[in-house]
């Protein structure tokens, strides 16, 4: 009986500890709002702290509803990294409970703000451009994402990714100064890797630079400008519902008139929607994944993400 009581007390104590902090085993982590930020953070925090992504694959940063367990993860994190309130408005309130030195809003960094693109901004002087025709007609008014004055898809900019990596390095150095050598080495490796990767992507994309295309999400401006691609514009289409006959006619007319080579959807689009858009034209259809769903977080994941995106462009435009 005595043995049983002792076991019961131990079990109750263990339960109390878990209730006090259900994430006590993984409390010291770098937590990012979305997967691509996790790619950058994982490269810098490699061998220092684990990196976790708050949003599950398939969830939208525009309208995610935090669970109590998510709030706990934010509070127990060593560092929280997000784009900023224009992209992840749902984080603004819970992050008031997190110390300022334990969070980074990347879009607000002094090193990043000069690199921000205005919404719908493209480099019109870019060679090979035939102009950008933006189609804003909607099948679903909630489907187009506006982030205010600036394009907030900043993880698609290698230049901003580099500044993000430096900021993450510097903050982790403040929080864990004992890891200086490892953090310094990680940052040097990331910067070298990024520079080499950019050279490879320039070579890969050169043959398709003058080929026009449309997208279903106005997210890619940073990547397109950086690598000299030729977007013709974007259509706003509900990923779940096939557009009506009149809308399809409008889209197909633009595809043909502007001599588009390809129209790109994203992983959340149903195949029937994608097929319906390009049907009856010679325009190919492809898929771009701006969040890198399925790419494992490790020290190579950001460059793997950029390479995957480049391959997705080339596979449809070549």
Curated annotation (Swiss-Prot):
Compartments, record wording: Periplasm
Residues the record lists as binding Zn(2+): 62, 153, 217, 289
Superkingdom, natural source: Bacteria
GO CC list: periplasmic space
Protein's job: Part of the ATP-binding cassette (ABC) transport system ZnuABC involved in zinc import. Binds zinc with high affinity and specificity and delivers it to the membrane permease for translocation into the cytoplasm.
Stated family: Belongs to the bacterial solute-binding protein 9 family.
One of the Pfam families matching this protein, by short name: ZnuA
Gene Ontology BP, a term: zinc ion transport
Region of interest called Disordered, as start-end residue ranges on this chain: 121-146
Disulfide bond annotation, renumbered to this chain: 262-316
Organism, scientific name: Yersinia pestis
A molecular function GO annotation: metal ion binding
Cleavable signal peptide: 1-28
Annotated Basic and acidic residues bias: 129-146
Protein name: High-affinity zinc uptake system protein ZnuA
Originating gene: znuA
CDD domains tied to this protein: ZnuA (cd01019)
Keywords, alphabetical: Disulfide bond, Ion transport, Metal-binding, Periplasm, Signal, Transport, Zinc, Zinc transport
């Amino acid at each position: 009986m005595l043995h049983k009581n002792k076991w019961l007390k131990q079990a109750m104590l263990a339960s109390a500890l878990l209730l006090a902090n259900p994430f006590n085993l993984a409390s010291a982590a770098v937590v990012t709002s979305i997967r691509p930020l996790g790619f950058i953070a994982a490269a810098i925090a490699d061998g220092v702290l684990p990196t976790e992504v708050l949003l599950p694959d398939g969830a939208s940063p525009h309208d995610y509803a935090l669970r109590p367990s998510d709030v706990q993860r934010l509070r127990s994190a060593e560092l929280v990294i997000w784009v900023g309130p224009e992209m992840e408005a749902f984080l603004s309130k819970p992050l008031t409970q997190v110390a300022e030195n334990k969070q980074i809003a990347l879009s607000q960094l002094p090193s990043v703000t000069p690199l921000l693109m205005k919404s719908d901004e493209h480099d019109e002087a870019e060679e090979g451009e035939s102009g950008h025709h933006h189609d804003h007609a909607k099948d679903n008014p909630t489907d187009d994402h506006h982030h205010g004055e600036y394009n907030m898809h900043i993880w698609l900019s290698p230049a901003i990714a580099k500044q993000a990596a430096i900021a993450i390095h510097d903050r982790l150095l403040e929080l864990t100064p004992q890891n200086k050598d490892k953090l310094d080495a990680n940052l040097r490796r990331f910067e070298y890797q990024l520079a080499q990767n950019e050279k490879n992507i320039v070579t890969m994309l050169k043959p398709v630079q003058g080929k026009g295309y449309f997208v279903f999400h106005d997210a890619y401006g940073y990547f397109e400008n950086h690598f000299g691609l030729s977007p013709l514009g974007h259509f706003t289409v509900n990923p779940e519902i096939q557009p009506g006959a009149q809308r399809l006619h409008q889209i197909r007319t633009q595809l043909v008139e502007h001599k588009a080579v390809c129209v790109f959807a994203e992983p959340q689009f149903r195949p029937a929607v994608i097929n319906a858009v390009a049907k009856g034209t010679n325009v190919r259809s492809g898929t771009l994944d701006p969040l890198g769903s399925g790419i494992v977080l490790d020290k190579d994941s950001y460059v793997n993400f950029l390479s995957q995106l480049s391959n997705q462009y080339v596979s449809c435009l070549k």
